[in-house]
């Protein structure tokens, strides 16, 4: 018995009348009622085409004998929200998305749901919703954008962000306009391995997306093929009773981390996987990420770490090929269940790597270590995260003098104004989950650093986040955050800070007695917040090492 059968009982005549008022007939009510949670809107370039993806999903549901019922949820474009107050709303939107899907599915007793996703916080929000639901769930993404072409060069959002600063400074407005018109050629999630594509790939690695689906470009017909197959598969999952609790296990999370390390994904993936683990009630300390990072080599160098794009990874075999490589070396849990009803290994055992320059063999990796590293030390007792694959090896150890800012805007002004000297560690604090609130991304700051030729001369440390497009020695998610009284709140201009990625250390070279005196004088900065979601998030958000999730 499916749970929507409740509407077929005689005493549910008023409910059936309401369904009929929406246009449904008896035959449709007798079939599985399948929700299609669509994050389409006309704002986000990664989502403008999701209406077509959702239509293909619904076609697949009908072909398999189900009744599709589409509803919407919100989606924020992190790129459009970047570099201003709007970025405070991005991370809190993750929980709102999870809430909206949970409410719609549970309130209307739907039998299953397909989640149509693509960009940064939408996929993590859907994953949190899946963790809460007791009905079958599949995700289908809208696919990556193709890289832009500027002259003979392939480019992406990162290139525009970094080059913009120099072009503006030199007054080359026409060249900036041409670059702006070339960087993002059409629909899809930004072409590099930024947060959106990272989280879609990890959803596939965890088994919540059909094998091969996550990397198919937005503009290809295969995107609609996968959408139809997803719609067909969800109906079968209702018959099988295949629910997320059977798929979203510790093994699935560890498989996702292994793929993340092999690819060198966005540092935001750590935040979102920690939030998912919290939602699932699974203890996932940051040390697990570090343990896996030390075992899994970095075998795919995709922008911003390298010159390849997600479309190249797709052509090389996609996530099935990556999982096959890791599986043959015993670096994933082969027996983890997936939405196909089969194990990960059953899905990928026949996959092949089609381009060894894009996906290297494990014995010839880009780096013997995973793409992300967890740092701890006197400046980050509970941890911090760096995209090690995007840091030149000669910068893995960096000792510098602190220049402290209490908001991103002040740091950006100083960088663009030529106030930052080589050997500086730029510290941006009070940008954490509660202190921000909202834990903004610092891409504007890091892009300015790279553009002005400081990328190998300075480092940046923050209790905020970084965009997946960030490269260079940028250390984020410093925990505890400044607003919670973490050591980062006590840093002063002129203090020495040591970053050692190989030893996984982040240390403030100030003696304990001096820190105690500073702590005695420290007072938390309280930002006035009007009523609304930021005020609520500031009160309820956990620290970055817990994913910035809302505390239950």
Curated annotation (Swiss-Prot):
Pfam families: ILV_EDD_C, ILVD_EDD_N. The active site is at 467 (proton acceptor). One of its GO terms (biological process) is L-valine biosynthetic process. The keyword Iron-sulfur applies. Its EC number is 4.2.1.9. Keywords: 2Fe-2S, Amino-acid biosynthesis, Branched-chain amino acid biosynthesis, Iron, Iron-sulfur, Lyase, Magnesium, Metal-binding. Pathway: Amino-acid biosynthesis; L-isoleucine biosynthesis; L-isoleucine from 2-oxobutanoate: step 3/4; Amino-acid biosynthesis; L-valine biosynthesis; L-valine from pyruvate: step 3/4. Its cofactor is [2Fe-2S] cluster; Mg(2+). It catalyses: (2R)-2,3-dihydroxy-3-methylbutanoate = 3-methyl-2-oxobutanoate + H2O; (2R,3R)-2,3-dihydroxy-3-methylpentanoate = (S)-3-methyl-2-oxopentanoate + H2O. [2Fe-2S] cluster binds at residues 119, 190. GO terms for cellular component: cytosol. InterPro entries: Dihydro-acid_dehy_C (IPR042096), DihydroxyA_deHydtase (IPR004404), DiOHA_6PGluconate_deHydtase_CS (IPR020558), ILV_EDD_C (IPR056740), ILV_EDD_N (IPR000581), IlvD/EDD_N (IPR037237). Mg(2+) binds at residues 78, 120-121, 441. It comes from the Archaea. GO terms for molecular function: 2 iron, 2 sulfur cluster binding; dihydroxy-acid dehydratase activity; magnesium ion binding. The modification N6-carboxylysine is found at residue 121. Binds 1 [2Fe-2S] cluster per subunit. This cluster acts as a Lewis acid cofactor. Functions in the biosynthesis of branched-chain amino acids. Catalyzes the dehydration of (2R,3R)-2,3-dihydroxy-3-methylpentanoate (2,3-dihydroxy-3-methylvalerate) into 2-oxo-3-methylpentanoate (2-oxo-3-methylvalerate) and of (2R)-2,3-dihydroxy-3-methylbutanoate (2,3-dihydroxyisovalerate) into 2-oxo-3-methylbutanoate (2-oxoisovalerate), the penultimate precursor to L-isoleucine and L-valine, respectively. Homodimer. Belongs to the IlvD/Edd family. This is Dihydroxy-acid dehydratase. It comes from Ignicoccus hospitalis (strain KIN4/I / DSM 18386 / JCM 14125).
């Amino acid at each position: 018995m499916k749970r929507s059968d409740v509407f077929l009982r005689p005493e549910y005549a008023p409910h059936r009348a309401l369904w009929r008022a929406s246009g449904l007939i008896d035959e449709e009510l007798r079939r599985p009622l399948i929700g299609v949670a669509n994050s389409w809107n006309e704002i986000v370039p990664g989502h403008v085409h999701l209406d077509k993806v959702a239509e293909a999903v619904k076609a697949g549901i009908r072909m398999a004998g189900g009744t599709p019922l589409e509803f919407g949820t919100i989606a924020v474009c992190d790129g459009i929200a970047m570099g201003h107050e709007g970025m405070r709303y991005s991370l809190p939107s993750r929980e709102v998305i999870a809430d909206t899907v949970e409410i719609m599915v549970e309130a209307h007793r739907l039998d299953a749901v397909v989640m149509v996703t693509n960009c940064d916080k939408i996929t993590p929000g859907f994953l949190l919703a899946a963790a809460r639901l007791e009905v079958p769930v599949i995700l289908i993404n809208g696919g990556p954008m193709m890289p832009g072409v500027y002259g003979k060069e392939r480019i992406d959002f990162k290139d525009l962000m970094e080059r913009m600063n120099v072009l503006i400074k030199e007054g080359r407005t026409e060249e900036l306009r041409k670059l702006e018109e070339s960087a993002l050629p059409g629909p899809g999630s930004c072409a590099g391995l930024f947060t959106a594509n990272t989280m879609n790939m990890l959803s596939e690695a965890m088994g919540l997306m059909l094998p091969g689906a996550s990397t198919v470009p937005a503009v290809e017909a295969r995107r609609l093929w996968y959408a139809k197959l997803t719609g067909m598969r969800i109906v079968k999952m209702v018959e099988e009773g295949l629910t997320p609790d059977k798929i979203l296990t510790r093994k699935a999370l560890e498989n996702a981390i292994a793929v993340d390390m092999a690819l060198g994904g966005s540092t935001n993936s750590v935040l979102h996987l920690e939030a998912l683990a919290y939602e699932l009630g699974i203890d996932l300390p940051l040390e697990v990420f570090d343990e896996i990072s030390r075992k899994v080599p970095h075998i795919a160098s995709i922008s911003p770490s390298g010159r390849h794009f997600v479309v190249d990874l797709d052509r090389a075999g996609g996530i099935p090929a990556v999982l096959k490589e890791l599986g043959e070396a015993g670096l994933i849990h082969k027996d983890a269940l997936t939405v196909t009803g089969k194990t990960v290994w059953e899905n990928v055992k026949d996959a092949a790597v089609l381009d060894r320059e894009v996906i290297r063999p494990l014995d010839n990796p880009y780096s013997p270590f995973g793409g992300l590293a967890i740092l701890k030390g006197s400046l980050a007792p509970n941890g911090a995260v760096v995209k090690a694959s995007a840091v030149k090896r000669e910068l893995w150890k960096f000792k510098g003098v602190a220049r402290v800012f209490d908001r991103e805007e002040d740091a950006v002004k100083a960088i663009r104004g030529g106030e930052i000297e080589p050997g500086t560690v730029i510290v941006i604090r009070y940008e954490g989950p509660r202190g921000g609130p909202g834990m903004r991304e610092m891409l504007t700051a890091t892009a300015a650093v790279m553009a002005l030729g400081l990328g190998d001369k300075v480092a940046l440390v923050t209790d905020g986040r970084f965009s997946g497009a960030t490269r260079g020695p940028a250390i984020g998610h410093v925990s505890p955050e400044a607003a919670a009284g973490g050591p980062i709140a006590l840093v002063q201009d002129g203090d020495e800070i040591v970053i050692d990625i190989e030893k996984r250390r982040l240390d403030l070279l100030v003696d304990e007695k001096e820190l105690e005196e500073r702590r005695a004088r420290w007072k938390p900065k309280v930002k006035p917040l009007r009523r609304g979601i930021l005020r609520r998030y500031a009160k309820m958000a956990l620290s970055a090492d817990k994913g910035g999730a809302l505390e239950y």
